UniProtKB/Swiss-Prot annotation:
Pfam families named among the record's database cross-references: Ribosomal_S4, S4
GO cellular component, one term: small ribosomal subunit
Binding partners and assembly: Part of the 30S ribosomal subunit. Contacts protein S5. The interaction surface between S4 and S5 is involved in control of translational fidelity.
Record organism: Polynucleobacter asymbioticus (strain DSM 18221 / CIP 109841 / QLW-P1DMWA-1) (Polynucleobacter necessarius subsp. asymbioticus)
Coiled coil: none
Stretches with biased composition (Polar residues): 42-53
Gene Ontology biological-process annotations: ribosomal small subunit biogenesis; translation
SMART domains in the cross-refs: Ribosomal_S4, S4
Native organism taxonomy: Bacteria, Pseudomonadati, Pseudomonadota, Betaproteobacteria, Burkholderiales
Protein name: Small ribosomal subunit protein uS4
InterPro entries per the UniProt record, alphabetical: Ribosomal_uS4 (IPR022801), Ribosomal_uS4_bac-type (IPR005709), Ribosomal_uS4_CS (IPR018079), Ribosomal_uS4_N (IPR001912), S4_RNA-bd (IPR002942), S4_RNA-bd_sf (IPR036986)
Function (record text): One of the primary rRNA binding proteins, it binds directly to 16S rRNA where it nucleates assembly of the body of the 30S subunit. With S5 and S12 plays an important role in translational accuracy.
PANTHER family listed in its UniProt record: 30S 40S RIBOSOMAL PROTEIN (PTHR11831), SMALL RIBOSOMAL SUBUNIT PROTEIN US4M (PTHR11831:SF4)
GO MF terms held by the record: rRNA binding; structural constituent of ribosome
Record-annotated S4 RNA-binding domain positions: 97-158
Length: 207
């Protein structure tokens, strides 16, 4: 599956907010002007962005945060629409329940991209079994662990140390000594961080 391999700061500037694509040890510097669009002098437009433009921009932002491509994102939205409850909130819950995101939230990867790589390289166990599919939906009670042969990777220890300095999410529990964690529950909307206006995405797909 194709992935964006270009500068992460460029994407953050395009969306005007930190997309958390870079780890805390290499966070966006002060030189990255989030209020200036990419381009030699920052692209400007004399006209106000349309409602459609804002909706499209929000969808692009969420896709980039979670590292999901268009076709897969549409499938997530269709599934969210099929389920009972608030479609936008359910969409975010589906994205947050992806295995690569759970690995990231547990602190085993410093970014979602790094967490995805750990899964793809079979460094992760789900309920005791090795898995290599980042998009697997994790369920409440599932146990996610680092495989024995991967426990010596310095990047995992460094990532856990960084997470210890930040506010941990409440819907996962982590045993840093065992390098394993439990997905306690699907997060509520207020538990999901990030400047996301999911209602704009719902409006976009409702056109």
């Amino acid at each position: 599956m194709a992935r964006y391999l270009g500068p992460k700061a460029k994407l953050a500037r395009r969306e005007g907010t930190d997309l958390f694509l870079k780890s805390a040890r290499r966070a966006l510097s002060d030189k990255c002007k989030l209020d200036t669009k990419p381009g030699q002098h920052g692209r400007t437009s004399g006209s106000r962005t349309s409602d459609y433009g804002n909706q499209l921009r929000e969808k692009q932002k969420v896709k980039r945060i979670y590292g999901v491509l268009e076709r897969q994102f549409r499938r997530y939205f269709a599934e969210a629409e099929r389920r009972k409850g608030n479609t936008g909130e359910t969409l975010l819950q589906l994205l947050e329940s992806r295995l690569d995101n759970v690995v990231y939230r547990m602190g085993f990867g410093s970014t979602r991209a790094e967490a995805r790589q750990l899964v793809s390289h079979c460094a992760i166990l789900l309920n005791g079994s090795p898995v290599n599919i980042p998009s697997i939906q994790v369920k409440p009670g599932d146990v996610v662990a680092i495989r024995e042969k991967a426990k010596k990777q310095a990047r995992i220890t460094e990532s856990l140390n960084l997470v210890g300095q930040m506010a941990a999410v409440t819907w996962v529990s982590v045993d840093a000594a065992k390098l394993e964690g439990t997905f306690k529950q699907v997060p509520d909307r207020e538990d999901i961080s990030g400047e996301i206006n999911e209602s704009l995405i719902v409006e976009l797909y409702s056109r």
